[in-house]
Design a protein with these regions (language model features):
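Phosphate/pyrophosphate-binding catalytic cores of soluble transferases and nucleic-acid-acting enzymes
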Residues: 1
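Acidic, contiguous N-terminal accessory segments
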Residues: 8, 22-91, 99, 106-120
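Gram-negative bacterial Sec-dependent N-terminal signal peptides
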Residues: 4-21
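Feature activates predominantly on carbohydrate-active enzymes
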Residues: 70-240
Length: 241
């Protein structure tokens, strides 16, 4: 039984790892809190599956020792070729799958070899990510998409959008809606961030020309409402420089 919509029981290990750039020597990064492996390995074809358990699904031994915090998980690979994941939320299950990807090495064909053992891991730092908040040419849309996927693969959870030379984030157009093409890009960034369990934070930088009036206070709120319609759910106000 799986308590999450993110991943379904019966997910093929080989299918999940297909197309991944698997390392010749597996390594988990960031380094997990606890790990215990034997010298054994197990080979997978398309048949083995992943069982994911959550407290909502009734719990199991897969949750033993897993702290109740976002992103925590346990990953168990048995000598019999069974893969189990215990997590309290979708982010934890997602991170466990990233660890599984890091542990896999390809055989000569389409199969995958995994080490036998278990990992219990959880984040020490609540907010893990970057701020795109510099002056100069902002990152391209493609670079941002690549960054968001990289964050998910490496278990980071925060991206703050605040490039100072975006005139719709800063002056002179922070009060105005994004043009349609740029709005569509924001929507896609939010979507990809969600897929990778990254919190997309959109920041406004109004300090160059804001007027300390009720009108401009309402303009800030209106801009946040515009961004909300694009899918943004986390916001920041920058007065750093």
């Amino acid at each position: 039984m799986n308590g999450f919509q993110l991943l379904q029981c019966g997910l093929s290990v080989a299918a999940f790892l297909a197309g991944s750039a698997l390392a010749a020597t597996p390594a988990v990064y960031p380094s997990p809190q606890q790990s215990k492996f034997t010298s054994q390995t197990v080979a997978f074809s398309g048949k083995p599956s992943v069982t994911i358990r959550s407290a909502k699904a009734g719990g199991s031994k897969l949750l033993d020792g897993v702290p109740e915090k976002s992103g925590a998980y346990k990953l168990v690979i048995s000598p019999q070729g069974k893969v189990g994941i215990g997590a309290h939320d979708e982010r934890g299950a997602f991170y466990a799958m990233q660890t599984l990807r890091q542990l896999g090495t390809k055989t000569g064909g389409e199969g995958v070899i995994l080490p036998v053992g278990e990992i219990t891991d959880w984040p020490d730092i609540e907010f893990r990510g970057t701020v795109e908040g510099f002056y100069g040419t902002p990152w391209s849309h493609e670079a941002r998409l690549s960054q968001l996927r990289f964050y998910g693969q490496n278990k980071m959870n925060t991206y703050i959008y605040g490039p100072k030379d975006d005139p719709y984030h800063s002056s002179p157009h922070w009060r105005d809606p994004y043009p349609a093409d740029q709005a569509a890009q924001i929507r896609e960034l939010v979507k990809v961030a969600k897929e990778n369990h990254v919190d997309f934070v959109w920041a406004i930088h109004p300090g160059k020309d804001i007027k300390w009036t009720e009108e401009d206070m309402n303009n800030v709120i209106k801009k946040f409402e515009m961004m909300y319609k694009l899918g943004v759910r986390s916001f920041a106000v920058f007065f750093d420089d």
